[in-house]
Amino acid sequence: MATKYPKFSRDLAQDPTTRRIWYAIATGNDFESHDGITEENLYQKIFATHFGHVAIIFLWASSLLFHVAWQGNFEQWIKDPLHIRPIAHAIWDPHFGEPAIEAFSQGGANYPVNIAYSGVYHWWYTIGMRTNNDLYQGSIFLLLLAALFLFAGWLHLQPKFRPSLTWFKSAEPRLNHHLAGLFGVSSLAWAGHLIHVAIPESRGVHVGWRNFLTTLPHPAGLTPFWMGNWGVYAENADTTGHIFGTSQGAGTAILTFLGGFHPQTESLWLTDMAHHHLAIAVIFIIAGHMYRTNFGIGHSIKEMLNARQFFGIRTEGQFNLPHQGLYDTYNNSLHFQLSIHLAALGTALSLVAQHMYSLPPYAFIAKDFTTQAALYTHHQYIAGFLMVGAFAHAGIFWVRDYDPEQNQGNVLDRVLKHKEAIISHLSWVSLFLGFHTLGLYVHNDVVVAFGTPEKQILIEPVFAQFIQAAHGKLLYGMDTLLSNPDSIAYTAWPNHANVWLPNWLEAINSGTNSLFLTIGPGDFLVHHAIALGLHTTTLICVKGALDARGTKLMPDKKDFGFTFPCDGPGRGGTCQTSSWEQSFYLALFWMLNLLGWVTFYWHWKHLGVWQGNVAQFNENSTYLMGWFRDYLWANSAQLINGYNPYGTNNLSVWAWMFLFGHLVWATGFMFLISWRGYWQELIETLVWAHERTPLANLVRWKDKPVALSIVQGWLVGLAHFTVGYILTYAAFLIASTAGKFG
């Protein structure tokens, strides 16, 4: 008999029911639970998958370059980036009728195409690419790199090339190599690319494979570097009249600190960014030499964490919190490591979302409004998923990897011991935020509905306005720090030399960009709604992780594993109590809820800025009907009009996705609000009917159909809810923005 799926578990492969498929999917990536796995083998498998992961990323980037070079309009777009729509790729669809072909022949193409809202055109243009040939070369290079990484992944699974467990657990050498090699050297290489290729291209000087060794990036060459006279590289910067991509108004500086934006492209100065990457490289290369490896010099992380002395003063550890035993706990738990890495990456990604629109790095991207909206939403959503993943893996750590003996008295032990205080405080703050914010919104809603809008409770966000004023925003007249020319912030070195401050102040006060947008009562309310979402999601995540080992109701929870369906009614109801259901299922709902509020706010606020009509947001965001009517309903009008009696338009694909997204989302509820007996009856009824229907009964199940467990039903529901939610909002966001701004 042929071996059945899954090969990694003999027990599961022999299960005669459809449970086999479900459990195999559920445990496919849980290498720890597979047959015959050893710790060393586990690390080696994960290590090899990293190469595969990088190969997929290179392949994806290669496909973008290839399709734009083949079917896009990169060379035409460069000539007029503000008015020509960038093309992602052609559409080949045999179902298209004449009206659809006409509607989707856009962006200057004479055949149906998709418009690109990813910002790749702006990125490639900024970093010095100018021709389709450049794109093809990049695509082939990445393809070869992907092949190389796939080979490397395979190679590291061969017996002679498998790293040992001790190699995986040497934290200091890994940290040194990642800091100095991965971050430091790659930042240095990127600074090199910007200085040698991108900056000359922005000044109309083409640097290619033929002349890059003979074209000096700076007229003085390396002399100022060797002489220690580095200021020379900042002299003669591009002027405010510089036309990007030409020599008109161009300077010769390569490393500057101009601050603010290039007036024409409305993006950060390339020379500022080169300076930034060089500085990052220096810092990280130094950081990559701090930890003790072969030579017995440098820091030992274990010694630092176990230390009880801080410059001669007796202490429990950093911030007086004891860290004894943390090194081994962290170094021996892949889930602990993954949890912290996901949390760090999730935070970084959210910061990327916030900075990409407020400090746009790519030329002309600030004026491609649909791309700005798509990139913000995309990065915030991914950040949300990563953060929830962080707490899910924290839950697995507490159940599988945490050793109470080894961590006695340290910070993990302390957090676990006073988890009731942490959870109850989060609960209190969530309740406070929820009731007060909703109370204000509902009050305002009622008085507006009764025709007395002057009775609204409108609160100015004075503390946030103070922070904006401290950064130099003059509008509020607060006269503090950078908005006060006599303050120490204004006059301190190096500002007194007027290095970056004039351009920064001009940018923050311009009113046409997204830097420190003017805020009022509507922002105050939605800020607190977002705070409610953040605190509630955090409450669920933290409770799910800290309660993973046990609670008053179920003190032996850890013995059941990370995910268990139910422990029966005998304990007073233990359904929905595993860390899996709390830190993953429930948290995802609140995470999506929160992201809805965040992206609605960002989008509506920016529609006003882009259309030059901020009054609509300011006046109508202070009550609920304003959000429903003037943001959601008003902006979905064009979307609902994607199909009409007059035929198709270029929003019709988004209109269809909008409808389909709602359908998928609503399907989720069927799986979420249900119980197991219902599914078992349904399955058996379907099988009975199937087996008695001509033709259909020629196909038989090999596995006996068994209903989904409650947890599996929820997973199906959650998947539909999430996918439908994202599809619906993505279609709404892109179509409503593109419909207004082309």
Swiss-Prot record:
Positions annotated to bind chlorophyll a B1: H662
Residue positions binding [4Fe-4S] cluster: C566, C575
PROSITE patterns: PHOTOSYSTEM_I_PSAAB
SUPFAM superfamilies per UniProt: Photosystem I subunits PsaA/PsaB
Co-factor note (free text): PSI electron transfer chain: 5 chlorophyll a, 1 chlorophyll a', 2 phylloquinones and 3 4Fe-4S clusters. PSI core antenna: 90 chlorophyll a, 22 carotenoids, 3 phospholipids and 1 galactolipid. P700 is a chlorophyll a/chlorophyll a' dimer, A0 is one or more chlorophyll a, A1 is one or both phylloquinones and FX is a shared 4Fe-4S iron-sulfur center.
Pfam families named in the record: PsaA_PsaB
Family in the record: Belongs to the PsaA/PsaB family.
Name this protein carries in UniProt: Photosystem I P700 chlorophyll a apoprotein A2 2
Source organism phylogeny: Bacteria, Bacillati, Cyanobacteriota, Cyanophyceae, Nostocales
